[in-house]
């Protein structure tokens, strides 16, 4: 039994190593990752153990295997993008992050998040707000993040316009799963998206509410 637990623990270490490499964009989409042999040497593991981990990643469509150019590659649509694909697909030029961590969660928002996952009580957490601007300096998106203070402190204004997952990867937090609900703001008619993110052990990490400021905007692939 102890031997089985040790194997499972080693598998998790190898799995997380690969996930964090991808999440931090050290291994971006279409990049060839380490070979079975390289991983075997790096982690002092058997070939069968390495293949077991790679099989899990293949089944989750995080990596792919090609025969023409033998090797494992990061999938093109691996799913670590911070932004949802929308009709206008605006590029973020810069972001402004609130310096204060405070209570931002409304009762209505709390109800939406509770419908996504009733086991996470976001009313216990504070929030921080980020404003996003396009290359023409037009303010087009507000995002509120809700989590424990130590998680919120990881967020970096200088990197928010790229991928906030990168900051979590640098801090050893592997984002594995996302649950999402979309709605429309009754007053503005604009798109609102509620997201909850979980690590590779299925533990809640952070939630976000994204308010898009263009009433014509629609999600085409979330």
Swiss-Prot record:
Keywords: DNA-binding, Transcription, Transcription regulation. It comes from Mycoplasma genitalium (strain ATCC 33530 / DSM 19775 / NCTC 10195 / G37) (Mycoplasmoides genitalium). One of its GO terms (molecular function) is DNA binding. The keyword Glycosyltransferase does not apply. This is Uncharacterized HTH-type transcriptional regulator MG101. Coiled coil: none annotated. InterPro entries: Tscrpt_reg_HTH_GntR (IPR000524), WH-like_DNA-bd_sf (IPR036388), WH_DNA-bd_sf (IPR036390). The lineage of its organism: Bacteria, Bacillati, Mycoplasmatota, Mycoplasmoidales, Mycoplasmoidaceae. Transmembrane segments: none annotated. Residues 8-77 form the HTH gntR-type domain.
């Amino acid at each position: 039994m102890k031997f089985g637990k040790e194997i499972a623990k080693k598998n998790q270490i190898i799995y997380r190593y690969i996930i964090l490499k991808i999440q931090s964009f050290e291994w971006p989409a279409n990049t060839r990752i380490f070979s079975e042999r390289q991983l075997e040497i790096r982690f002092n593991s058997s070939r069968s153990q390495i293949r077991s981990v790679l099989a899990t990643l293949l089944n989750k469509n995080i990596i792919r295997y090609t025969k023409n150019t033998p090797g494992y590659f990061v999938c093109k649509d691996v799913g670590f993008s911070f932004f949802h694909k929308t009709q206008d697909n605006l590029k973020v030029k810069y972001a402004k992050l609130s310096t204060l961590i405070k209570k931002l969660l409304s009762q209505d928002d709390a109800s939406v998040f509770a419908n996504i996952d009733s086991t996470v009580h976001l009313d216990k957490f504070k929030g921080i707000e980020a404003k996003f601007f396009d290359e023409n300096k037009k303010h087009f998106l507000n995002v509120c993040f809700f989590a424990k203070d130590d998680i919120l402190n990881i967020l970096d204004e200088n990197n928010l316009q790229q991928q906030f997952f990168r900051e979590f990867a640098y801090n050893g937090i592997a984002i594995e799963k996302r649950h999402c609900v979309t709605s429309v703001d009754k007053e503005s008619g604009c798109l609102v998206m509620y997201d909850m993110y979980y690590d590779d052990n299925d533990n809640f990490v952070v939630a976000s509410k994204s308010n898009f400021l263009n009433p014509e905007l629609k999600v085409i692939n979330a």
